[in-house]
Amino acid sequence: MASNSWQFAGADDESDDDNFNPAPADMSDEENNDNDEETTHNHRPAGKTVRQASSPVPDEEEEEEEHDEEEDARPAKRSRRDHHDDDEDEEQDEEENEEIDEEEEEDEEEEEDEEDEDDVHGGNRRKRRNKDRRAAFFDIEAEVDDEDEGEDEVGDGEEIEDFIDNAHPDDIADSGRLNDDRRHRELDRRREMEASLDAEKQAEILRERYGKRAPARGYGDMAIVPRRLLLPSVEDPSIWAVRCKEGKEREVIFSIMRRIEERMGTKNEVPITAAFERGGINSVMKGYIYVEAQRQNDILVALDGILNVYPRSNMHLVEIKDMPDLLRVIKTPNLEPGAWVRLKKPAKHAGDLAQVIDVTENGLEARVRFIPRLDYGVRDDPVFQADGKRKRPGVPGPRPPQRLFSEAEARKRHPRYLQGNPQTNSWNYNGDDFENGFQVKDIKIQQLEVKNVNPTLEEVTKFASGAEDGTENLDLKALAATLKDSAKSVAYVPGDIIEVYEGEQQGVIGKATNVQGDIVTLQVTEGDLAGRTIDVPNKGLRKRFRIGDHVKVIGGSRFRDEVGMVVKIVDDRVTLLTDQTNTEITVFSKDLREASDIGGQGSLGQYSLLDLVQLDATTVGCIVKVDRESVVVLDQNGDTKQVQPSQITNKLPKRKFAVAADRNGSEIRLDDVVREYGGQQRQGKIIHIHRSYIFLHTTTTNENAGVFVTRANSVTTVAAKGGRNTATAGPDLSAMNPALKRNPTASGKQMPAPRTFGPDRAINQTVVIRRGGYKGLLGIVKDTTDTHARVELHSRGKIITIPKADLSFKDKVTGKTIDINQRGGSRGGFGGGGRGGGEFGSRTPMASGGSDRTPAWGSSRSTARTPAWNRDAGGSRTPAWNDGSRTVNPYDGSRTPYGGATAYGGIGSRTPAWHSGSRTPAPDSFGHGSKTPAWSAGSDSWGSKTPGYGASAPTPGASGDAWGYTPGASGGGNSSSAYDAPTPGGGLSAPTPGAALNAPTPGAYSAPTPAAVSAPTPGAWQGGWGSGGDAVSAPTPGALGAPTPGAPGYADDD
C-alpha cells in the first residue's frame, strides 16, 4: 500500500513535469536563470529539462501569456498536493513563498541587466518600460511554483560564455560622447563668430535672442510711491536706543539673532521686530544698539540675560524724524598723501591747516604735518599763564602763535628734553616729533576735518619749501585737489569777469550774466566767441582781474575786508597793495571781487587805527583794523576781536609820560625800542603802556597791522628814546621796601660780604624765589656761579637758572629767612658794636613775660636767652646748677654750663677759674708788678694802652656805659679810660679772660654776639651796677651764675 502510494506520488510528479508548459524558443535568460535557481533550492534531480537561452527578448504580450499560463497551472498543481500530508504541505508552502519573494527581486535585477546588454548589442536604445513606484508595495507578479520551474543546471562553459563579454570597446562606444564633442565645437565656433562682429550686430543678435521673452512678473504695486509715504509714522513700531558696552555692539546683535532662532515657533518667541547697530571706530553712535518693537517692555523681555547690554538703564526713544538717519550710510572720506585737512584735536591746534603725509592701511589714522605752536617759554609751562601768574593745572592758556620749530631755542630752554639728528633735521622735543621745522603726528581720521578745508594762500605758503634759487615750491596738484571741492562754494555774481581755465572752452573770458546752481551763464567779451552767450559749470571757472583793478578781499582769508589795488597776477594768485597799511598781500582770486568803494583813511567815527580803547572794566585793546562798519581789536591777552563801535566803552587817551620798568628794572617809555626776553624775541617800538602791559609795533610782520602785546617785565630795552641812559634812569626800588623804611639803620652803609674760599655756601641751601615767573616757589640750590644759581624746584622737580639777587635763603627746619654770609649773631648799630635797635620785632625770638619760656626769659628788652634762666625754675636748667656735677672748680666743682657762666657776662665764663691764685697774668689788685703789661688806672685813658689793665676793662666791653664801644672798658663811665677801651682790661681790674664785675668776653652792654639787650643769643643781665636789675640771674651763658670754671663768690647775693 505504501509502495502504491509512493508510485502514485511519483507518477503525479512526472505528470506535473510533463504537463508544465515547455519554455518557448525565445525564452529569456531571466526565466531560465530563475528555473535554475529553483532547481537548486528544491534539490531536484538534474537532466529532466534543459532550457537554452535565446537571444531575442520576448514581447510584452508573450510575457503576459506566460504569466497567465503560470497562474492557470498553479491551481491544478495545488489540487494535486492535497493528497499529501498536511505537514508536508505547510512546509512546502512556506518554502514556496520565500522563494517567490527572492525570485521577484532577482527578476527585476536581471531584467535591467538584460536591457543594458540588448542596448549594447543592438546599438539602438529600446524604450524602457516605466514601472510604477507603487508596485513595490503590492504583490502584482505571478507566483511560480518551484516545481513548475526547471531544475536543469547550466553547464560551466555556458555560464562563462554568458559572463564574459567578447565585444570590442570600439564597437560598443557611446555615440552620445561624439555628439557632445561636436556640440562643444559648434558652440566655440559660434562664440568666435559673435566676437568678430561689431557691437551693433551683437546687440541685434542679443535682442533677437532674448528680446521676445516676457519680463518677470513683479510682486506688489508697480506704481511710483512718494518718498514721504515711505517714512515711518506713529503706527509703525518704535525704535529705542539701548546702551551697551562699547565695542561689543555686533556681539550683542548676534546674541539677539540666535535667541530669535532658538525661540522661533515656541510660545516664548522674542517680541521684537528688528535690531541693528551703527558702531565702529569712526562712528558717533558706538556704544548703542537700536531695537525696534511695539512696546518698551518687549525690549526688556528680549534682552533679558544677554551680556554686554544694559536695557534697564539709559534707554532712549528715537524720534520719528530721526529714524531715517539711523539707516543712512555716510561714505568714509578717502585721504591721499598731499591732501590738505584741518585739525580738530588737540585743542591747541584746533582749526590749523595740516598736510597728509601717509595713511594707514586700515584707513583709521593718518600721519600729518603741521606748523607747531611753541613758545619755548613760560607759556609752555602748564603751571603758569602768559602773564607769569600761577594757575590751576588743566586750565587752557592762550595759544602760542604758529612758528616753525627752532632747535636753537629749544636747546636754550629745555636741553634735557631735546633729542634728534641735525643732519636729517629731525628732532624730538617734549615727546613730539619735528621734521624740517614741522610737527609730525599720527591722528585719527575722525579728528580731522576733510571737507570744506578752504586753505588760504598764506597758510599754504608756509608749507612751501624753498628751491635752490630761492623760489617757492608749491604742490599745486595737491592744492588743486583740495580746492576742487571748495570751488563749488565760490559765489559768482552777475558782473564778475570770469575765465574758463579747464575744459573744452578753456581760455574763454567773459562777464557773468546769470548764475543758477552750478551753471554760470557767460557773455564772452574776448576771442572768437565774442558776443556769444555760453553756459559753463562753475568747477572750471575762476575770477579774472587786471593790474590796476581796485578789489576787496571777501573770502576766508585773514585779510578779509582789506581793500587795495592789484599789482601782480600769477595764475590764480593775486597780489594787491592795501589802502590802509600800504603793504602787499597775496590771496587767491576766488577770494576777491571788484570794490566800488575806495579805502578810507583808517578811521571809523572817533576811532582810528592803533587807538587804545576800553572794551570792558578789565579789558583794553588796540585797534588793528578798521572796516566800514566794525573794527578789529587786539586785546591785552593777545586775542583779536571784531567789535562794533557801540561795543567800545571809551577811547583811552595816549599817555605820553607813561613809565614802566623792564625786566632789568630800567625805565621804559613810549617810542622806546624793546625786545622780548623769551619766546619769539620779537622787537618793536612801544606805542601804548597800560598798567603792566605794553603794545608794540613792528615792521617785520603784517599780522594785526604789525601790532603785538606783551608784559613790561618780559622785555629788555634795546634803544631808549632820546638816547637817555637807562642804567640809572630807573626809580629807587629799595625805597619801596617797607622793611627798610621800618629799620632805616639796617640799610646804612654796610661792608660787602667777605670773600670766602672753598665751595659756595649757597649750595644745598633752601631758597624761595622772590620775583619773576617762579615767584614764591621753594627749591634747593644745586650749583652756583658768581651771579646766578641753578635751583631745583620742590613742586616741579625741574632745575632752573635764576639770579642770586632773586633768591631768599630759608632755614631748613624753622623756615625763617637767614643770611648765609653772616657769621654768628646779628650786628646792631653802626659798625656792628652797639646795642642795636630797640624794637621787639628785631628780636629772635620775641620776648614775653613768661619766665619758663625757652629761649625767651623775660619781659624786658633783652631777649632770647637759652635755656631759661630763672633760678626758681632750677629744674629746667641743663645741667642743673649748685650740685655735685659741677666741674672743675677749686671750691665746689666747675658748673657746666649753667647761669651766666658761658660765654658772656658772668664769672663762670672765665677760663680757668678766676680766683686770684689762678688769674693770669694778674693775681690780684695789689700785685701791680705782675700785670702784663701794667698800667695805671689814673693815667691817661687816651693812650690806647694795649694791653692794659684797669679796674673794669672787659674784652671787648664792660658794663661802664650804654654806648657799647668795642672794645670798651669803664668803671664808672665818667673817666676818660672808659672811652679808651683797652684790651684786655682796664678800669675795675678786669683780668683776661674774666673780670670781677661781670666783664665777659665779648661784652655785655655793647651787644655783640652774644649780647644782652638787643636780644642776642646768649644774652646777659639787664643792667649795670645800681640799675636795679638782677645782675646775678644770668641765663646760660650769663653772668655770675655757676661759672665754668669760676668761683662762687658773690654770685649768691640774692
UniProtKB/Swiss-Prot annotation:
Q: What is its main location?
A: nucleus
**Cross-referenced SMART domains, in alphabetical order?**
CTD, KOW, NGN
Report biased composition (Basic residues) as residue ranges.
123-132
Molecular function per GO = chromatin-protein adaptor activity; mRNA binding; transcription elongation factor activity
Q: Which UniProt keywords apply?
A: mRNA processing, Nucleus, Transcription
Write out the biased-composition intervals (Acidic residues): 27-37, 58-72, 85-119, 140-155
Pfam families annotated for this entry? Answer: CTD (PF12815), KOW1_SPT5 (PF23042), KOW2_Spt5 (PF23284), KOW4_SPT5 (PF23291), KOW5_SPT5 (PF23290), KOWx_SPT5 (PF23037), Spt5-NGN (PF03439), Spt5_N (PF11942)
SUPFAM superfamilies the record matches = Translation proteins SH3-like domain (SSF50104)
Q: Where is the composition biased (Gly residues)?
A: 825-840
What biological-process terms (Gene Ontology) are attached?
mRNA processing; regulation of DNA-templated transcription elongation; regulation of transcription by RNA polymerase II; transcription elongation by RNA polymerase II; transcription elongation-coupled chromatin remodeling
Give the source's domain of life in one word: Eukaryota
Q: Does the keyword Metal-binding apply?
A: no
Note the coiled coil stretches, chain numbering. none
What subcellular compartments does it reside in?
Nucleus
Here the segments flagged for biased composition (Low complexity) are: 1004-1020, 1034-1054
Q: What protein family is recorded?
A: Belongs to the SPT5 family.
Protein role: The spt4-spt5 complex mediates both activation and inhibition of transcription elongation, and plays a role in pre-mRNA processing. This complex seems to be important for the stability of the RNA polymerase II elongation machinery on the chromatin template but not for the inherent ability of this machinery to translocate down the gene.
How is the subunit organization of this protein annotated in UniProt? Component of the spt4-spt5 complex. Interacts with RNA polymerase II.
The name on file for this protein is Transcription elongation factor spt5
Q: Which gene encodes it?
A: trf-3
